[in-house]
């Protein structure tokens, strides 16, 4: 009976650990400077290709069509 109780306890402990890892991995976010997407969000700031505090607009020459 003692062996059965121990194996059931170990089994339940493994299930609890797997649930904990799932919560940690699914709520993962990225710090500033790391690549991000809408599905892999930034911990703080906003996603501009990489996690940043502010997205800066790139102003410059526009590309021209060449034939």
Curated annotation (Swiss-Prot):
Q: Which residues form the propeptide?
A: 63-67
Matches recorded under Pfam families: Conotoxin_I2
Species of origin reads Conus virgo (Virgin cone)
| Described purpose of this protein according to its UniProt entry | Kappa-conotoxins bind and inhibit voltage-gated potassium channels. This toxin inhibits the mammalian potassium channels Kv1.1/KCNA1 and Kv1.3/KCNA3.
Q: Which InterPro entries match?
A: Conotoxin-I_CS, Conotoxin_I2
Q: Where is the signal peptide?
A: 1-26
Entry text on domains: The cysteine framework is XI (C-C-CC-CC-C-C).
UniProt family annotation: Belongs to the conotoxin I2 superfamily.
Task: Provide any one GO MF term from the record.
Answer: potassium channel regulator activity
Q: What does the record say about PTM?
A: Contains 4 disulfide bonds. Here are reported disulfide bonds proposed in [PubMed:16268797], even if the connectivity known for the framework XI is I-IV, II-VI, III-VII, V-VIII.
Answer whether the UniProt record assigns the keyword Electron transport to this protein.
Answer: no
Q: Any other comment in the entry?
A: Negative results: has no effects on Kv1.2/KCNA2, Kv11/KCNH, and Kir2.1/KCNJ2 potassium channels, and on Nav1.5/SCN5A sodium channels.
Which organs or tissues contain this protein?
Expressed by the venom duct.
| UniProt protein name | Kappa-conotoxin ViTx
Where would you say this protein principally sits, based on its record?
Answer: secreted
Residues bearing Isoleucine amide?
59
Q: Where in the cell is it found?
A: Secreted
Q: Which UniProt keywords apply?
A: Amidation, Cleavage on pair of basic residues, Disulfide bond, Ion channel impairing toxin, Neurotoxin, Potassium channel impairing toxin, Secreted, Signal, Toxin, Voltage-gated potassium channel impairing toxin
Note the SS bond partners: 29-48, 36-51, 42-43, 47-55
Which GO CC annotations does the UniProt entry carry? extracellular region
């Amino acid at each position: 009976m003692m062996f059965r109780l121990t194996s059931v306890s170990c089994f339940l402990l493994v299930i609890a650990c797997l649930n904990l890892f799932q919560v940690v991995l699914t709520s993962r976010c990225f710090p500033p400077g790391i690549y991000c997407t809408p599905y892999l969000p930034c911990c703080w700031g906003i996603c501009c290709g990489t996690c940043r505090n502010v997205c800066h607009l790139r102003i410059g020459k526009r590309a021209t069509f060449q034939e």
